[in-house]
């Protein structure tokens, strides 16, 4: 909800972020991150981050580089099928959706 698009956020003029709270994950937590770009340092054409923490019952996927706010998916059934449905509504073309799904699959493999 904070990131509203590329280089945009929900802060109003004159507002400043005072703190960021990052909840502690359990020792069982696993994560993965994958970014698709042509060369190092380049902005992503597709990216996905995955957090799986069975002890805290957390399964979260974030898909970025979609041209708008990142797509955040939570729940036990989060995976490529759920992401594909969300990406259909993102406005990305078929190639963009396929790159995002490839990034998600690779991030999920890292988190396994």
Task: Tell me what each language-model feature is.
Residues 1-112:
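C-terminal structural segment of proteins
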């Amino acid at each position: 909800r904070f990131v509203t698009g590329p280089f945009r956020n929900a802060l109003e003029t004159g507002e400043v972020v005072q703190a960021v709270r990052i909840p502690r994950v359990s020792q069982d937590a696993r994560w993965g991150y994958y970014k698709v770009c042509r060369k190092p340092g380049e902005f992503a054409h597709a990216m996905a981050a995955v957090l799986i923490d069975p002890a805290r019952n957390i399964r979260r996927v974030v898909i970025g580089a979609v041209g708008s706010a990142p797509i955040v998916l939570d729940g036990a059934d989060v995976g490529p099928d759920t992401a594909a449905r969300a990406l259909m509504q993102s406005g990305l073309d078929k190639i963009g959706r396929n790159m995002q799904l490839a990034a998600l699959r690779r991030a999920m493999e890292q988190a396994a």
